[in-house]
């Protein structure tokens, strides 16, 4: 029999009608001579009632046999409940069962199918198809679908063209490691799964498409954390003939539309803008969380003449003030903060507390000569805790930025109802890599340098600035973009600055450089992390909660056991031989 409707959509207006529902048994219980069954489908729960006194004997027998997660088909009449359950959308009604069929049975599940499940992450991922039955998870994916639907409608209305770009591409250096795919036809050669459609979308601008978008899978072989996965989805945009402000305006409109449609939130436009340098110096992060204060303060000049070499001789001394919470931090808890700080390169963590109107702590005795000025500069008050880092400016910023976020979480200082968007602009073009011993692209090698700094491509690379912009939400990088290079000579200079010889530049990017001989228009774009955006909209702290079949922190899938070994015959066809390190 055809299903009449979803169980979770039955309401008082359906009283007196006969309907057929299909779904899973969430719970069955016997009470007062009646059999109550909670039927669950993707839209919610509906209570079914079997009365042995007037129900068919076969129906009663079937009802008695039901266990959790059995799949059933039920037909009956909608009736008003004697006692309504205000906690359920269907709580005013119940279904008097007239016919009941078991469509499939189920073993006892490894965890209960309900929100707030107590199961390890590995167990949830091993039985992901069960985990996804939970109402909370279903809601996450309804939200995700609504977000993508809204994005497509918005961009379609602005005459963007949805174009699919290749999944099998050329491996190019820079950025994260590629996932490689061996070619059977051209043995010894490899495709790469795209880290982004960067070059192909630029080529679409050269083709005259003018406005492109794609909701696209991307792949990066990098270390994983809560907001990263080896395969992820981004909303990819590229435009011709627009400046950075126009691209940002389009992006803000898109985000405002999504926020209104999915959360009912009206965001204020335009979004605030903050330079990269201000973000690093004041927040210790290029993706600052502006929902709380506790800004970094520079004390380098103030402490340069005190009798404490650790401060006086350090390239930079910076501090944060934890207002009104010194009593919550014992020496033991500060030692934990010190260990945390060392993860970011700091040699240690100095601290003082304001207690009974005076500074107290291990370094307080070295600060007596500047105590009044220090107290005034930092606005230190009773029961404040001050944390100092003395090191290079980079380490001081990074360490205190991480401490700022950690302490805000510990003290519950963050208003999780806020959505604070901002643009981080005026980026450096390059960043120094200690591992590589050279400058690397802060974004990618195709970013346009500012006109007034491009001359430094043959000089001091630290002075080259990029026409680049990142969009940040609540301390997460939501996406980033830039204007792109469209002049061949400038692109060649950029690649040379990154250490490419002319030969290697053409070997890797010859097709792009050749395209620049054929009227490449000015262009720019942006990519937004869809998984991360939906994660934040859903109020989650791990993107696995909004990806249907994610990988764990070892880039493995406990359900399918991917990645897995393959047969020798498959390797032979690819002319590959695998030697494991432990063999």
From Swiss-Prot:
Its EC number is 6.1.1.12. Pfam families: GAD (PF02938), tRNA-synt_2 (PF00152), tRNA_anti-codon (PF01336). One of its GO terms (molecular function) is catalytic activity, acting on a protein. It comes from the Bacteria. Coiled coil: none annotated. SUPFAM superfamilies: Class II aaRS and biotin synthetases (SSF55681), GAD domain-like (SSF55261), Nucleic acid-binding proteins (SSF50249). Residues 198-201 are annotated as: Aspartate. It catalyses: tRNA(Asp) + L-aspartate + ATP = L-aspartyl-tRNA(Asp) + AMP + diphosphate. It is found in: Cytoplasm. InterPro entries: Aa-tRNA-synt_II (IPR004364), aa-tRNA-synth_II (IPR006195), aa-tRNA-synth_II/BPL/LPL (IPR045864), Asp-tRNA-ligase_1 (IPR004524), Asp-tRNA-ligase_1_N (IPR047089), Asp/Asn-tRNA-synth_IIb (IPR002312), AspRS_core (IPR047090), GAD-like_sf (IPR004115). L-aspartate binds at residues 174, 220, 443, 484. CDD domains: AspRS_core, EcAspRS_like_N. ATP binds at residues 220-222, 229, 477, 529-532. One of its GO terms (cellular component) is cytoplasm. GO terms for biological process: aspartyl-tRNA aminoacylation. Keywords: Aminoacyl-tRNA synthetase, ATP-binding, Cytoplasm, Ligase, Nucleotide-binding, Protein biosynthesis. NCBIfam families: aspS_bact, PRK00476.1. Belongs to the class-II aminoacyl-tRNA synthetase family. Type 1 subfamily. Homodimer. Catalyzes the attachment of L-aspartate to tRNA(Asp) in a two-step reaction: L-aspartate is first activated by ATP to form Asp-AMP and then transferred to the acceptor end of tRNA(Asp). This is Aspartate--tRNA ligase.
């Amino acid at each position: 029999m055809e299903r009449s409707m979803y169980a979770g959509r039955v309401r008082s207006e359906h009283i007196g009608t006969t309907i057929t529902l299909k779904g899973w048994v969430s719970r069955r219980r016997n009470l007062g001579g009646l059999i109550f069954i909670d039927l669950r489908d993707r839209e919610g729960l509906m209570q079914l009632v079997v009365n042995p006194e007037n129900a068919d004997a076969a129906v009663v027998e079937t009802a008695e046999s039901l266990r959790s997660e059995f799949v059933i088909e039920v037909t009956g009449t909608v009736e008003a409940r004697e006692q309504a359950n205000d906690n359920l959308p269907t709580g005013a009604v119940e279904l008097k069962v007239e016919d009941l069929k078991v469509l499939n049975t189920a073993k006892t599940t490894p965890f209960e199918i309900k929100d707030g499940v107590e199961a390890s992450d590995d167990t949830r991922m091993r039985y992901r198809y069960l985990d996804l039955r939970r109402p909370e998870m279903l809601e996450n994916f309804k939200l995700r679908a609504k977000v993508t639907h809204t994005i497509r409608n918005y961009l379609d209305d602005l005459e963007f063209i949805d174009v699919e770009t290749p999944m099998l591409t050329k491996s190019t250096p820079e950025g994260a490691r590629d996932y490689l795919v061996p070619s059977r036809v051209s043995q010894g050669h490899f495709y790469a799964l795209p880290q982004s459609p960067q070059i192909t979308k630029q080529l679409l601008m050269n083709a005259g498409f003018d406005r492109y978008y794609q909701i696209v899978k991307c792949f990066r072989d990098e270390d994983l954390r809560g907001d990263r996965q080896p395969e992820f989805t981004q909303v990819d945009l590229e435009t011709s003939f627009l400046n950075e402000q126009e691209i940002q305006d389009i992006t803000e409109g898109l985000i405002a539309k999504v926020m209104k449609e999915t959360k009912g939130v009206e965001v204020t436009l335009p979004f605030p803008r903050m330079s990269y340098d201000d973000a690093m110096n004041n927040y210790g992060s290029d993706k600052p969380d502006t929902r709380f204060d506790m800004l970094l303060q520079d004390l380098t000049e103030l402490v340069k003449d005190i009798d404490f070499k650790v401060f006086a001789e350090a390239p930079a001394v910076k501090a944060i003030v934890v207002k009104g919470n010194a009593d919550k931090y014992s020496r033991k808890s500060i030692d934990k903060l010190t260990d945390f700080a060392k993860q970011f390169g700091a040699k240690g963590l100095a601290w003082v507390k304001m207690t009974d109107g005076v500074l107290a702590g291990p370094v307080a005795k070295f600060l007596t000569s500047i105590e009044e000025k220090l107290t005034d500069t930092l606005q230190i008050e009773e029961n404040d805790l001050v944390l100092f880092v003395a090191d290079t400016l980079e380490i001081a910023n990074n360490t205190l930025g991480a401490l700022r976020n950690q302490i805000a979480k510990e003290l519950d200082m963050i208003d999780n109802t806020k959505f604070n968007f901002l643009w981080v602009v005026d980026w450096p073009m390059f960043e120094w890599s200690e591992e590589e011993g050279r400058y690397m692209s802060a974004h990618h090698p195709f970013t346009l340098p500012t006109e007034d700094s491009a001359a430094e491509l043959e000089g001091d690379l630290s002075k080259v600035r990029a026409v680049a912009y990142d969009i940040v939400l609540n301390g997460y990088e939501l996406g980033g973009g830039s204007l792109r290079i469209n002049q061949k000579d400038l692109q060649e200079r950029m690649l040379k600055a990154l250490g490419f010889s002319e030969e290697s530049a053409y070997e890797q990017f010859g097709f792009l450089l050749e395209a620049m001989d054929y009227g490449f228009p000015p262009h720019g774009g942006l990519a937004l992390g869809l998984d991360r955006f939906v994660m934040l909209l859903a109020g989650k702290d791990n993107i696995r909660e909004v990806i249907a079949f994610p990988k764990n922190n070892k880039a493995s899938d406990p359900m399918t056991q991917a990645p897995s070994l393959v047969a020798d015959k498959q390797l032979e066809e690819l002319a590959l031989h695998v030697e494991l390190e432990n063999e």
